[in-house]
């Protein structure tokens, strides 16, 4: 399984963005991509439960799957950022905050239609840099 997998899920639980893209990932098996998505989607239930009990936007640890830790950030518009990583760094909040700033810039673009998949090479590059900066990759 990949060391790091990051997704942005829309308020309607549709996948808006993923890093790395399926085509860029190297898998040990064909089912690995599906397993990554399954783990992330099952974590959405945990996120919804935690969101009901607390007004927090950042959830440091929502689930553990094998050696992977899942963290989440939920915007006020109910957009969910979910990170699955083997890294044990404590600064995932900084990563989510930086990605949130990028997300806000994207949705403020008049050519972007809300709740549609995000196709941005600039975002891919910046997320790759952020993952290295926060030692998550």
How would you describe each model-predicted region?
Residues 1-5, 11-137:
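Acidic, low-complexity cytosolic segments
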């Amino acid at each position: 399984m990949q060391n790091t997998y990051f997704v942005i899920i829309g308020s309607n639980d549709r996948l808006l963005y993923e890093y790395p893209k399926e085509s860029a990932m190297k898998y040990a098996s064909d089912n690995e991509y599906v397993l990554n998505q399954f783990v992330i989607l099952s974590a959405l239930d945990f996120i919804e439960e935690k969101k009901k009990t607390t007004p927090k936007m950042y959830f440091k640890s929502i689930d553990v799957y094998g050696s992977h830790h899942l963290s989440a950030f939920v915007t006020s518009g109910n957009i969910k950022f979910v990170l699955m990583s083997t890294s044990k760094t404590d600064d995932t909040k900084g990563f989510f905050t930086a990605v949130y700033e990028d997300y806000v810039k994207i949705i403020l673009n008049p050519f972007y239609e809300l709740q549609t998949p995000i196709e941005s090479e600039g975002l891919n590059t910046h997320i790759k840099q952020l993952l290295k900066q926060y030692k998550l990759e």
